[in-house]
């Protein structure tokens, strides 16, 4: 149990997808203008990562891994296309659920919801799972923790950006300029966790 708590804390803070690996920056910067929208997208990313990482773990372990289907047959060259297909299917299902049950959130997320399919934070989580050889339970914990870490980062950035609307930002830094500086400072804050040994 201690191992799983350690993995959860590590994936949320120490190896934060957005602020340590800078994955998922497109949607991270574009949707982080309002806390409500950021929270909605963050929940969507948590759901997709929590489902995609363990599901792709099963696909990799029982179909693609060297010797999984037939001894001596390695289908790992199909990793990218298979993982993206699984992620795309999950995002499509999530999009239909949001459209049906949460129309305001669906409309607020707009084009960024289908872009979760190609969000490199999602694919990065799946790739790290394969690279680190996590088992099924570890992949559930890692997927959930990575999603929560990404959501924590985007909601924090959205809160800061909402407060910055009322700040006196120099004209040359308004918009993305001050946002990049803010993200850099947030990343420095999360970098302080890098020395933590769990």
From Swiss-Prot:
Classification via InterPro entries: NqrDE/RnfAE (IPR003667), NqrDE/RnfAE_oxidrdctase (IPR050133), NqrE (IPR010967)
Which enzyme class? translocase
Provide the GO MF annotations for this entry: oxidoreductase activity, acting on NAD(P)H, quinone or similar compound as acceptor
Its transmembrane ranges are 11-31, 39-59, 77-97, 110-130, 140-160, 176-196
Reaction(s) catalysed by this chain, per the record, are: a ubiquinone + n Na(+)(in) + NADH + H(+) = a ubiquinol + n Na(+)(out) + NAD(+)
What are the entry keywords?
Cell inner membrane, Cell membrane, Ion transport, Membrane, NAD, Sodium, Sodium transport, Translocase, Transmembrane, Transmembrane helix, Transport, Ubiquinone
Q: Which family does the entry's similarity section mention? A: Belongs to the NqrDE/RnfAE family.
Name the chain's protein.
Na(+)-translocating NADH-quinone reductase subunit E
């Amino acid at each position: 149990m201690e191992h799983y708590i350690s993995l959860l804390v590590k994936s949320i803070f120490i190896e934060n997808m957005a602020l340590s690996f800078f994955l998922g920056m497109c949607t991270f910067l574009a949707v982080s203008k309002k806390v409500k929208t950021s929270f909605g997208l963050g929940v969507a990313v948590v759901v997709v990562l929590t489902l995609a990482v363990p599901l792709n773990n099963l696909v990799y372990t029982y179909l693609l891994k060297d010797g999984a289907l037939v001894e001596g047959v390695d289908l790992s060259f199909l990793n990218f296309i298979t993982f993206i297909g699984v992620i795309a299917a999950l995002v499509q299902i999530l999009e239909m659920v949001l459209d049906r049950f949460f129309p305001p959130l669906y409309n607020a997320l707009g084009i960024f919801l289908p872009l979760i399919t190609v969000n490199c934070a999602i694919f990065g989580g799946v790739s790290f799972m394969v690279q680190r050889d996590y088992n099924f339970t570890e992949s559930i914990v890692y997927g959930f923790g990575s999603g929560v870490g990404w959501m924590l980062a985007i909601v924090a950035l959205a809160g800061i950006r909402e407060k910055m609307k009322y700040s006196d930002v120099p004209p040359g830094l308004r918009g993305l300029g001050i946002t990049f500086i803010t993200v850099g400072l947030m990343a420095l804050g999360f970098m302080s966790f890098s020395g933590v040994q769990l």
